[in-house]
């Protein structure tokens, strides 16, 4: 994948997260600084989602751990488990929010 393709796909993923948080009832604060999204929950825990252009990856740091995602067969997939990005982010956010939080592309 070219650098421009990566940036287009990765930016679309960040935009989808921003849209989902606009539509949720969960108390999650969102801050964006360049290629980094910080989601802060009511209990003061955070999830950090950041782009890693040199690796063509998106990384998530959550209470559950650190995870790397690459674009494979039309989806962002965890490089270790193969879990789809938005499913994983939904799971981590639900754990930290204490209520259902759903993200989708």
From Swiss-Prot:
Transmembrane segments: none annotated. Keywords: Iron, Metal-binding. One of its GO terms (molecular function) is ferrous iron binding. Pfam families: Frataxin_Cyay (PF01491). The keyword Iron applies. GO terms for cellular component: cytosol. GO terms for biological process: iron-sulfur cluster assembly. Belongs to the frataxin family. NCBIfam families: FeS_CyaY (TIGR03421). This is Iron-sulfur cluster assembly protein CyaY. It comes from Paraburkholderia phytofirmans (strain DSM 17436 / LMG 22146 / PsJN).
């Amino acid at each position: 994948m070219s650098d421009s393709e990566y940036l287009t796909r990765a930016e679309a993923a960040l935009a989808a997260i921003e849209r989902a948080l606009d539509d949720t009832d969960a108390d999650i604060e969102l801050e964006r600084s360049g290629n980094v999204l910080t989601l802060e929950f009511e209990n003061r825990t955070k999830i950090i989602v950041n782009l890693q252009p040199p690796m063509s990856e998106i990384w998530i740091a959550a209470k559950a751990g650190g995870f790397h995602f690459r674009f494979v067969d039309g989806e962002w997939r965890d490089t270790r488990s193969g879990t789809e990005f938005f499913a994983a982010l939904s799971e981590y956010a639900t754990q930290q929010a204490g209520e259902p939080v759903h993200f989708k592309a």
